[in-house]
Regions:
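Sec-dependent N-terminal signal peptides
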Residues: 8-19
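N-terminal secretory signal peptides that target proteins for export/translocation
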Residues: 1-8
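C-terminal segment of N-terminal export signals and the immediately downstream linker at the start
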Residues: 34-38
């Protein structure tokens, strides 16, 4: 995931490491007290999505239609392959946030991908496409960070590559761990519940620091890495390709996490005075770690959450939380407790470029991943790709925007059956 939270996959965003909470700006009139800025990522108590009615303005699909291409085609195919698996049915019907309202049944969600792909291929123009989509789909919009403003913060994540060893040796002294048998998670949502004791009761899991000092994970090491920061980054991302000393590759993915709270390392480093907010990036975090690894390791413990991993064959690397390959510029990660899996979304925001500065970004993307830091209706992570360039782009992705879900109207679900082979 990939660098993001963890899943999975979930994968995790670079800015889960690097971002700090927004700061309020002082008002111009001294006699007025400015309203405090509402931080991003607060959990909701109510609906996560609002269905746009006949009188509501609809988002334009023109720019996203023009930007369609091979990556969108591949991402659609990956979602279809997931819906082809019987296990996908357990995640539906999708409730609307914490309410009892249904957003989508499995039949609507799976047929929606088929319908979208067919209409995309058959439409002669953006206008024709918009008309046909609005005829058979309902458009739902994220409620945003306070349940009413409908603004979503879009960060970025990528697939990191690291060096490591299956055995502890030389410079490889920092482990990732397998999932412990006593970790309890919700079988449908994957939400961590804690640790099951011998008497059957469930209690909160140990913190990151407690796990490190107790040694209770000894013997559960999956792979050894060059630094504790490498291990931490993979935990935040939820997935990685790790090159062994003999040149072979090992692929690791999210296998669960503890129920302890997440706290961003970047925020901790700013609070501690190791970095300033205007110079906050993954590169600056790495630089600070090289100068004083002990200080940064101490701040890592403010993030009490701990992520566990499993090895997989890598044939579908980089895989998101659905177990299918995520696609650059066409896959997003969201909170799967409140948003439906596998379906088509419309993302309207801005995104960085290597040389031209930020640009408007309007794309159809498939919701195929999740992340440890992506835990609310106002947060989503855009998948930027693999390697160094993707890391730079992911590190610069921090822009608000709008997030829409295209949900097939129930009366059309039977008209768009899944293809036999998932493609």
């Amino acid at each position: 995931m990939i660098v993001r939270s963890a899943r999975r996959r979930g994968l995790a965003p670079v800015l889960a490491l690097c971002t700090v909470l927004p700061l309020g700006l002082a008002g111009c009139q001294k006699e007025k007290t400015p309203e405090p800025e509402i931080p991003w990522g607060l959990p909701i108590d109510g609906p996560a999505l609002v269905k746009l009615g006949p009188g509501d303005p609809k988002p334009s699909f023109a720019a996203a239609f023009s930007a369609r291409g091979r990556n969108l085609d591949e991402s659609l195919a990956q979602s279809l392959s997931w819906f082809q698996k019987p296990s996908s049915k357990q995640f539906f019907p999708q409730k609307n946030g914490t309410t009892a309202e249904n957003v989508a049944t499995w039949e609507q969600a799976s047929a929606g991908v088929v319908a979208f792909r067919q209409i995309l291929a058959e439409s002669s123009s953006a206008t024709d496409f918009q008309t046909r989509i609005e005829q058979v789909f309902d458009i739902w919009q994220s409620v945003g960070k306070d349940g009413t403003d409908r603004q979503v913060l879009f960060t970025g994540y990528y697939s990191p590559e690291f060096k490591g060893s299956r055995t502890r040796s030389g410079r490889f002294q920092h482990p990732l761990h397998r999932r412990p048998a006593d970790l309890v998670t919700d079988p449908v949502t994957g939400e961590p519940k804690g640790r099951r004791l011998a008497d059957g009761s469930v209690v909160s899991y140990a913190t990151r620091g407690e796990l490190a000092r107790s040694g209770e994970l000894a013997g559960a090491e999956l792979v050894w890495l060059e630094s504790s920061l490498d291990a931490y980054i993979i935990q935040v991302n939820g997935s990685a390709r790790i090159t062994m000393p003999d040149g072979s590759n090992m692929f690791v993915g999210y296998a669960g996490k503890t129920d302890r709270p997440y706290f961003g390392l970047g925020r901790s480093m700013v609070d501690a005075g190791l970095l300033t907010e205007d110079r906050l990036s993954l590169a600056s975090i790495r630089s600070a770690y090289r100068k004083d690894p002990a200080a940064v390791e101490a701040l890592m413990e403010r993030n009490e959450s701990y992520v566990f991993f499993t090895e997989y064959d890598g044939s579908n690397w980089p895989a998101g939380s659905l177990g299918v390959r995520v696609t650059e510029g066409a896959s997003i990660a969201t909170d799967k407790k409140i948003f439906p899996r596998g379906g088509v979304t419309l993302v309207n925001t801005r995104t960085p470029t290597i040389s031209r500065g930020p640009e408007n970004f309007s794309r159809f993307m498939l919701d195929q991943d999740t992340g440890g830091a992506i835990t609310a209706a106002d947060r989503a992570d855009l998948y930027m790709g693999i390697g160094a360039t993707a890391e730079i782009l992911a590190g610069g992705q921090y822009f608000p925007g709008s997030l829409y879900y295209l949900i097939l109207k129930p009366e059309y679900a039977s008209q768009y059956p899944l293809p036999a082979n998932g493609r």
